[in-house]
Structure formats: structure tokens, C-alpha cells
Amino acid sequence: MAKRLRISPDEPIFALHRIRYMDDIPALVEYTYIPATYFPHVEEQDFSMLSLYDYMKKYNRISTDFHQKLTIMKCPKKEAKYLNIVSKDDSIFYFEYLGRTNKGEVVEYTRAYYKSEAVQFRFNQYYADF
């Protein structure tokens, strides 16, 4: 994980694991990792009451640039349990993303498993003039 966050292996990492609900139905399981040295006392925060990005903003280390990867895959057993997915053949949306500040500091790595019937994604794509 230190390699993904571009920190030394001996630096502390804070892990935030959450199940997100939409209309009282579990919609996604999210695993977020941030360099603890950038965020003093992060382990004392109640992120059920506080937005992670609001907290990061306090320390002027908010993600402004995201490198994202989307994969459609079968749901792993552990996440299927959290998402109440019964069929082992159900597919989910798996996102991996790395968040960087405007200074290029990596401040977040997240893996998220989205229940496919609970979410919808829309994308806009723009091309620069050639």
C-alpha cells in the first residue's frame, strides 16, 4: 500500500472501510487508504458524521486529480456478503482510484465495489482540438 501512496514503507497508513447505503440498501463497499502523516489525529475522526474530503480540506490536501480504473467483475465473497448479493454470478462495478493534490501528492487510494443494480454512471468525453 505504501508503494501505491508513494510513501516509505515505515510511514503509517490510515484505512477507512465503509459500506455505503442508498435508500437503506447497501450499494457499495469502499476501502480507502490515506497517508496518516498528512492528516494528524485521523484515527480519532468519526467518518460516519464527517466527510473524508471535508477533513482532508482542513489540511489543504484535497484530491483534485484522480486516476481511475473501472472493471466489471464477479463480486468477491466478502463484498457479496456486505452487499447482500446471493448469486455468485452477479457482476459488480469495481473502481480503483488514486487521488492527488494539485501539488502532485498522492493522498488517497480507494477500492470500491458497486452493486450494479444500485447505481448508474454517466460519462462526458471531450476531445482537444488537433
Language-model features: where?
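C-terminal all-alpha effector/ligand-binding and dimerization domain
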Residues: 1-130
